[in-house]
Structure formats: C-alpha cells, structure tokens
Amino acid sequence: MKMKQLILTLCASLALISFSGIAKDIKIGMAIDDLRLERWQKDRDIFVSKAESLGAKVFVQSANGNEETQMSQIENMINRGVDVLVIIPYNGQVLSNVVAEAKREGIKVLAYDRMINNADIDFYISFDNEKVGEIQAQSLVEKVPQGNYFLMGGSPVDNNARLFRDGQMKVLKPFIDSGKIKVVGDQWVDGWLPENALKIMENALTANNNKIDAVVASNDATAGGAIQALSAQGLAGKVAISGQDADLAGIKRIMAGTQTMTVYKPITQLANTAAEVAVELGNDKQPKSDATLNNGLKEVPARLLTPIKVDKSNIESTVIKDGFHKKSDL
C-alpha cells in the first residue's frame, strides 16, 4: 500500500513538473517606431490587450522616430530576458546586428507591419503594401485621369514606403508613358511627419505656380501636411490627394472634401493576429503563413492582410462599422 502511494505521489510530481515546463510565461518586448502617431497607439493598445489575454506579459517602448534610440531600446529588452521581440522598425535597414544579438540569446523576432531587411527574423506580418499603393493611385486616376501629379513618398528609410511607391507606379506608369499624366515633383517625407510634408508641398506649389492637379500622398499624416499648404493657396478640395491609415483627422478631411480617400488597414485584425503569432513563437511553435518575402538574407514566412479603400461613400460601412472610429467623433 505504501509503495502504491509512493508511485502515485511520484507520478503527480512528474506531471506537475511537466505542466510547469509547458505553461511558461511569455515575455514580449514591443519596440515601436513612434507612439506620437495615432496609428501606432491603436496598434499598441490592441496588441497588448490580446497578448495579455493569452497569458503573455508585454513591455512597450517607443523610439519617437530615432533609429539609435530604437536599437538601444531593443538591446534593453534583450537584457530583460524577453522571449519574443515584436519590432515596428523606424529604419528596417539598420537592425541586422541587434537582431543577431537577440537570436544568439534564443529570442524570436517578429517584424510588425514593416520588414526588417538583411536580418534573421522569424516572421513578418503586415498588409499587402504594394496593393495599398495601387489602391491610392487608382483612386486618383479615376478622379483625375490627366494632369500634373506630385508624388509624395513616405519616410525614405521605411521599406513600406518603397512598396507603396512600387504599387503606385504600377498604376501610374501607363498614364505617364502616354503623356496623360505629368509628374511635376517627387519627394520623400522624412519621418512621415506632417510638418515636413507641409514644407515640401509649399515648395512644390511655388515651383509649379500652383499648377498641381493631384498629390499621391502615401499616408494621412503627410496628406494632412500637404492639405495645409493647399489650403493656404485656396486649393484644398480642388486638388485630389490620397492617404492611408484611416486616421480620424483623415476621415474628417474626406467628409469635408479636402482629402479624396484613404486606405483602411483593419488594425484590430493585424494587432490581434500579431499577438497570437508572438505567443506561438514564444512557445516555440511555427505560426501559419500565407506568403514568404525575401528580406535580403532569407525567405521570411509572412502573413499578409487585405487593405480597404475608404472614401466618402463607404465610411460608415468600413471604419464606423468595425468600431475603428465612433460616429460621434466625426
């Protein structure tokens, strides 16, 4: 009888040890480009809520648009012993060394919404960013099939900005080649900052004697800066302009008629899925992918979500219906 009791106790102890090994607390370090932007605040809140509901602990830091700060913050998270790094890079070209450091410590790395190039990352989640650019340009050529176009790219160190441009040019090139569209300027907006976009647009208007018919702006923040410059010349609402992110200010401008459209990327879906992927990585599981993208070093397994065009006609059926914005806020 004593032997039987001893065996049962031993089995229970082994089961407890086994269970403890499986149910480890996942620690996630979330390194964000710039929380001064409304867009990333939403991502953070949704991601943290979902990850915590899955039993993970999340440490968040914002680099405020500074690559050296971000590298230092990532190193700090490595030293804190996180299991997974979720990185929204300010500059996806400069993180290969710090990612290598993380990998040496056995830390998994998820690139969130922006690719990290030439680095041994484990997974990438984003939207189809070339498609974003196509949607932007297609919306403008439908409204302004010929005339003077100004191309306003995003941050020159953001890989996504290049992908947006690739998509835009797929649509614009035939119009440019036929002479229907003339590109009268092409500049990139450092840090995606509205104040930089404002200065660029002011200079573009001066250089072209205000003769600009459409502005291919790559997100709502830069569109907002450009529209400030257009407004000062009495051109707001007369010049077609694209956007992206469905920021509250951007949606309000669309309703007012000063911005033509935006691209809504259902952030709830992105952030929730990213949290699930991060926890899977932390548990040494391989998340399901629907694509692979080459980052210069390797083929990175990825999940790419579908972006949605939003203009005055479908605000209610998209961003309001999804709860991304409240109707009362508009």
Language model: regions and residue ranges:
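A residue-level marker of the well-folded mature domains of exported/periplasmic proteins
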Residues: 23-330
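Generic N-terminal leader/processing signal
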Residues: 2, 15, 22-25
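Bacterial N-terminal signal peptides that target proteins for export
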Residues: 1-8
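Bacterial N-terminal signal peptides
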Residues: 9-18
